[in-house]
Design a protein with these regions (language model features):
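Fungal secretory targeting signals
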Residues: 1-21
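Sequence-level preference for short, compositionally simple segments enriched
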Residues: 20-53, 58-414
Length: 414
């Protein structure tokens, strides 16, 4: 009866998750710089570059022109972006630290972005659009569709094909060591349904943190390439098919996964054999899985797979996360049409302390695909410090994560 009630509430648009997103405190590091004032650079670090499509005080009218003006060295730079809708593709290849700030009063007011019940119209003041999809393989690789790509060069960012993807040369350098974005939405709205890979962002051979950002597409929304490390905090990620996929390491904290429909799975990862014990995979912690709106909610009840293995070394884990009724009772699924479903002894598709009307522990355990972990089994993956590594496999590797985030002690130990 409780599950029926939750389904009816969602259909009426009245459902509300009880996950921690409602109590998120956004990153505070740049709140004075991001705040809307008559002097846009008031409170900003010295040397901050200002981008605006209309303000004559701005040095650049496009974001990419500001990025391209920076030297490819180890110096740190900050770019402040005025409110507006920007239609452009962004490409970051430099190694030095770079921060993109969306003008917003949210951080100053302490308002969460991932709490999707907070606003009637949920969006940041800075929107970046690039509508493109690799439908019928019209591009040589999925990376060409991305709104934002972070990586040292083209080869490093390619997805490729086959069980190991594109063979990135061993001598490829590492890209940006500390890339950060605050209060910006990345939207690839090529079609209102999954119509081929359509990246909102891609991160390869780089460390990237995203705070109070939105990522909107339908298929393959977020791509984390080889040796890519990405940390999402207080974000919204929207998609339908395999919308978290890749080879690297992605940790999503206190965020909302917005289910626009169901197809394939939410996660799809290709693990890699290394000489060290790696932690490549996708980890979703203290977050919520919700139908995107009241129209789709009753249509996708019990239909959304938590993920499917892109190869047999797939690793994904949902921790302390709320499931609405959209989630498939069995949890994960094998990859239909692939030998052995890409599922084997080294495949990790797991949950730990998840809850909500979409969580069915009996069905998940009976599936023989979804693993319900004990505390000891989950312990190696619970915090960012547990999973992020250098390319050589050394830990800790979290200096690039914003230190203003207030975590329970179990999440981030510096």
């Amino acid at each position: 009866m409780t599950r029926l009630r939750d389904i009816l509430l969602l259909a009426l648009g009245l459902g509300r998750a009880v996950a921690g997103t409602a109590n998120n405190t956004p990153a505070q590091t740049f709140k004075q710089c991001q705040k809307k004032t008559t002097d846009p650079l008031n409170g900003c670090p010295p040397g901050t570059i200002y981008v605006s499509q209309a303000d004559k005080r701005a040095r650049f009218q496009t974001i990419q022109s500001a990025i391209s003006s920076l030297p490819n060295d180890n110096t740190s730079h900050v770019i402040l972006i005025a409110p507006g809708i920007y239609t452009e593709q962004l490409n970051v290849t430099r190694q030095g630290p770079l921060t993109l700030l969306g003008t917003s009063d949210r951080p100053f007011r302490g308002e969460s972005y991932a709490d999707i019940d907070h606003d009637v119209v949920h969006e940041n003041d800075v929107q970046i659009y690039w509508n493109s999809a690799n439908h019928d393989a019209i591009f040589p690789d999925n990376v060409y569709t991305s709104v934002l790509t972070i990586g040292p060069n083209l080869n490093a960012t390619l997805t490729g094909s086959g069980p190991t993807g594109f063979p990135v040369p061993d001598d490829t350098p590492f890209g940006c060591t500390d890339f950060r974005v605050y209060n910006i939405d990345f939207r690839n709205e090529y079609a209102p349904y999954a119509n081929g890979p359509a990246h909102a962002i891609g991160v390869s051979r780089a460390n990237a943190g995203f705070y109070s950002c939105g990522f909107y597409s339908w298929q393959d929304t977020v791509y984390i390439g080889k040796l890519g490390n990405a940390y999402f905090y207080d974000t919204v990620v929207a998609g339908q098919t395999d919308f978290l996929y890749g080879f690297g390491t992605l940790f999503i904290q206190s965020s909302t996964l917005s289910l626009r429909n169901c197809g394939g799975g939410i996660t799809a990862w290709k693990g890699t054999n290394t000489t060290f014990t790696n932690k490549y995979g996708v980890y979703i912690s203290d977050s919520q899985l919700l139908a995107a709106n009241s129209s789709v909610a009753p249509v996708i009840v019990d239909k959304c797979s938590l993920g499917r293995p892109w190869n047999a070394l797939h690793r994904s884990l949902y921790m302390n996360t709320y499931f609405d009724p959209s989630v498939l009772p069995a949890g994960y699924t094998q990859w239909a049409g692939r030998p052995d479903g890409n599922f084997g002894a080294n495949t990790t598709m797991a949950v730990y302390k998840v809850y909500g009307p979409g969580y069915d522990e009996v069905a998940e355990e009976a599936s023989d695909v979804t693993a319900v972990l004990t505390e000891n089994a989950a312990k190696p993956y619970l915090r960012p410090v547990d999973v992020f590594m250098t390319p050589e496999g050394k830990q800790p590797n979290i200096k690039w994560i914003d230190a203003s985030i207030k975590f329970p002690s179990r999440h981030l130990k510096r």
